[in-house]
Protein backbone atom coordinates (compact mmCIF):
# COMPACT_ATOMS: atom_id res chain seq x y z
CA UNK A 1 0.00 0.00 0.00
CA UNK A 2 2.77 2.46 0.93
CA UNK A 3 4.62 1.80 -2.34
CA UNK A 4 1.47 2.47 -4.38
CA UNK A 5 0.81 5.66 -2.43
CA UNK A 6 4.40 6.84 -3.02
CA UNK A 7 4.23 6.09 -6.76
CA UNK A 8 0.95 8.01 -7.08
CA UNK A 9 2.30 11.02 -5.17
CA UNK A 10 5.49 11.48 -7.23
CA UNK A 11 3.87 12.99 -10.37
CA UNK A 12 1.86 15.46 -8.28
CA UNK A 13 4.94 16.52 -6.32
CA UNK A 14 6.88 17.24 -9.51
CA UNK A 15 4.01 19.18 -11.10
CA UNK A 16 3.39 21.22 -7.94
CA UNK A 17 6.88 22.75 -7.87
CA UNK A 18 7.29 26.41 -8.82
CA UNK A 19 10.28 27.84 -10.62
CA UNK A 20 12.75 29.49 -8.24
CA UNK A 21 13.93 32.77 -9.78
CA UNK A 22 17.18 34.28 -8.53
CA UNK A 23 16.74 38.06 -8.61
CA UNK A 24 20.23 39.04 -7.47
CA UNK A 25 23.29 37.50 -5.86
CA UNK A 26 25.69 40.46 -6.01
CA UNK A 27 26.58 41.77 -2.56
CA UNK A 28 24.56 39.07 -0.80
CA UNK A 29 21.19 40.88 -0.61
CA UNK A 30 19.49 40.25 2.72
CA UNK A 31 16.39 41.17 4.73
CA UNK A 32 14.20 41.16 1.60
CA UNK A 33 10.73 42.64 1.43
CA UNK A 34 8.40 42.24 -1.55
CA UNK A 35 4.95 43.56 -2.43
CA UNK A 36 2.51 42.94 -5.28
CA UNK A 37 0.41 45.83 -6.58
CA UNK A 38 -3.21 44.99 -5.63
CA UNK A 39 -4.50 46.93 -8.66
CA UNK A 40 -2.10 45.28 -11.16
CA UNK A 41 -0.71 41.95 -9.97
CA UNK A 42 1.92 41.94 -12.73
CA UNK A 43 3.71 44.80 -10.94
CA UNK A 44 5.98 43.81 -8.07
CA UNK A 45 8.64 45.69 -6.12
CA UNK A 46 11.22 44.12 -3.81
CA UNK A 47 13.85 45.68 -1.58
CA UNK A 48 16.97 44.31 0.12
CA UNK A 49 19.76 45.68 2.31
CA UNK A 50 21.24 48.14 2.14
CA UNK A 51 19.69 50.16 -0.71
CA UNK A 52 18.67 47.66 -3.39
CA UNK A 53 15.34 47.86 -5.19
CA UNK A 54 14.01 45.41 -7.79
CA UNK A 55 11.10 45.70 -10.22
CA UNK A 56 9.03 43.12 -12.07
CA UNK A 57 6.24 43.95 -14.51
CA UNK A 58 5.50 40.33 -15.48
CA UNK A 59 4.39 38.86 -12.13
CA UNK A 60 7.93 38.02 -11.04
CA UNK A 61 9.20 36.14 -14.09
CA UNK A 62 11.89 38.76 -14.83
CA UNK A 63 13.39 41.55 -12.71
CA UNK A 64 15.36 44.76 -13.15
CA UNK A 65 17.61 46.20 -10.46
CA UNK A 66 17.95 49.72 -9.10
CA UNK A 67 19.55 51.60 -6.23
CA UNK A 68 17.55 53.70 -3.77
CA UNK A 69 18.95 57.09 -2.75
CA UNK A 70 17.73 59.81 -0.38
CA UNK A 71 19.20 62.91 1.23
CA UNK A 72 18.19 61.29 4.55
CA UNK A 73 20.45 58.34 3.75
CA UNK A 74 19.43 54.75 3.10
CA UNK A 75 20.55 52.24 5.70
CA UNK A 76 18.60 49.03 5.22
CA UNK A 77 15.68 47.27 6.88
CA UNK A 78 13.52 47.65 3.75
CA UNK A 79 9.76 47.33 4.01
CA UNK A 80 7.81 47.58 0.74
CA UNK A 81 4.13 48.53 0.50
CA UNK A 82 1.71 49.33 -2.32
CA UNK A 83 -1.44 51.32 -1.64
CA UNK A 84 -4.85 50.93 -3.27
CA UNK A 85 -4.01 53.63 -5.84
CA UNK A 86 -1.02 51.57 -7.05
CA UNK A 87 1.71 53.76 -5.52
CA UNK A 88 4.66 51.87 -4.05
CA UNK A 89 6.43 52.85 -0.82
CA UNK A 90 9.94 51.88 0.31
CA UNK A 91 10.47 52.33 4.06
CA UNK A 92 13.99 52.11 5.46
CA UNK A 93 16.33 53.29 8.17
CA UNK A 94 18.10 56.61 7.72
CA UNK A 95 21.80 57.14 7.67
CA UNK A 96 22.04 60.62 9.14
CA UNK A 97 25.03 62.88 8.94
CA UNK A 98 27.58 62.82 11.76
CA UNK A 99 28.90 59.98 13.87
CA UNK A 100 25.87 59.91 16.17
CA UNK A 101 23.26 60.60 13.50
CA UNK A 102 22.76 57.18 12.01
CA UNK A 103 19.42 55.47 12.55
CA UNK A 104 17.93 58.79 13.64
CA UNK A 105 14.58 58.29 11.85
CA UNK A 106 12.46 56.00 9.65
CA UNK A 107 12.26 57.17 6.03
CA UNK A 108 9.34 56.68 3.61
CA UNK A 109 10.04 57.03 -0.12
CA UNK A 110 7.21 56.87 -2.66
CA UNK A 111 7.05 55.83 -6.32
CA UNK A 112 3.79 56.84 -7.99
CA UNK A 113 4.56 55.86 -11.60
CA UNK A 114 5.70 52.27 -12.06
CA UNK A 115 6.83 52.92 -15.65
CA UNK A 116 9.04 55.86 -14.58
CA UNK A 117 10.48 54.18 -11.46
CA UNK A 118 11.32 57.51 -9.84
CA UNK A 119 11.25 57.59 -6.04
CA UNK A 120 10.58 60.69 -3.94
CA UNK A 121 13.41 61.90 -1.71
CA UNK A 122 11.20 60.84 1.16
CA UNK A 123 9.39 61.92 4.26
CA UNK A 124 10.17 60.60 7.71
CA UNK A 125 8.87 59.72 11.12
CA UNK A 126 10.85 59.97 14.32
CA UNK A 127 13.98 62.16 14.21
CA UNK A 128 16.18 62.01 17.25
CA UNK A 129 19.95 62.21 17.00
CA UNK A 130 20.27 60.84 20.53
CA UNK A 131 18.26 57.64 20.01
CA UNK A 132 18.36 54.80 17.47
CA UNK A 133 15.25 54.04 15.40
CA UNK A 134 14.98 50.49 14.05
CA UNK A 135 12.73 47.53 13.20
CA UNK A 136 9.94 49.37 11.39
CA UNK A 137 6.92 47.65 9.89
CA UNK A 138 4.15 49.13 7.78
CA UNK A 139 0.55 48.29 6.84
CA UNK A 140 -2.06 49.93 4.63
CA UNK A 141 -5.77 50.20 5.37
CA UNK A 142 -7.46 49.57 2.01
CA UNK A 143 -10.71 51.21 3.15
CA UNK A 144 -9.20 54.72 3.40
CA UNK A 145 -5.64 54.19 2.08
CA UNK A 146 -4.16 55.20 5.45
CA UNK A 147 -0.62 53.98 6.13
CA UNK A 148 0.33 52.85 9.64
CA UNK A 149 3.86 52.34 10.94
CA UNK A 150 5.36 50.97 14.12
CA UNK A 151 9.05 50.87 15.03
CA UNK A 152 11.37 50.58 18.00
CA UNK A 153 13.31 53.49 19.49
CA UNK A 154 16.30 52.55 21.64
CA UNK A 155 17.88 54.80 24.28
CA UNK A 156 21.14 53.12 23.35
CA UNK A 157 21.27 50.28 20.85
CA UNK A 158 22.47 46.94 22.33
CA UNK A 159 22.84 48.49 25.78
CA UNK A 160 22.77 46.15 28.78
CA UNK A 161 22.18 48.98 31.27
CA UNK A 162 18.91 48.83 33.19
CA UNK A 163 18.55 52.59 32.78
CA UNK A 164 18.44 52.29 28.96
CA UNK A 165 15.05 51.41 27.52
CA UNK A 166 13.38 50.69 24.22
CA UNK A 167 9.98 52.00 23.16
CA UNK A 168 7.51 51.05 20.45
CA UNK A 169 6.41 54.08 18.44
CA UNK A 170 3.40 54.45 16.14
CA UNK A 171 2.71 56.88 13.33
CA UNK A 172 0.15 57.19 10.55
CA UNK A 173 -0.18 59.02 7.27
CA UNK A 174 -3.49 60.01 5.72
CA UNK A 175 -1.94 61.78 2.71
CA UNK A 176 0.05 59.10 0.92
CA UNK A 177 3.17 59.33 3.06
CA UNK A 178 3.67 63.10 2.74
CA UNK A 179 3.20 63.76 6.47
CA UNK A 180 3.20 61.55 9.58
CA UNK A 181 1.43 62.02 12.92
Where are the predicted features?
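Bacterial Sec-dependent N-terminal signal peptides
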Residues: 1-18
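C-terminal PAP-associated
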Residues: 16-181
Amino acid sequence: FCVILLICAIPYTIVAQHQNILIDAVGNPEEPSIYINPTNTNQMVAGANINKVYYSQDAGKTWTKGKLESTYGVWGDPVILCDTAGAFYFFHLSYGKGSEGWLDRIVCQKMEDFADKTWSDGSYMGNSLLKDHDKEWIVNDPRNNAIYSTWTVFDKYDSKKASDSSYIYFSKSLDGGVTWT
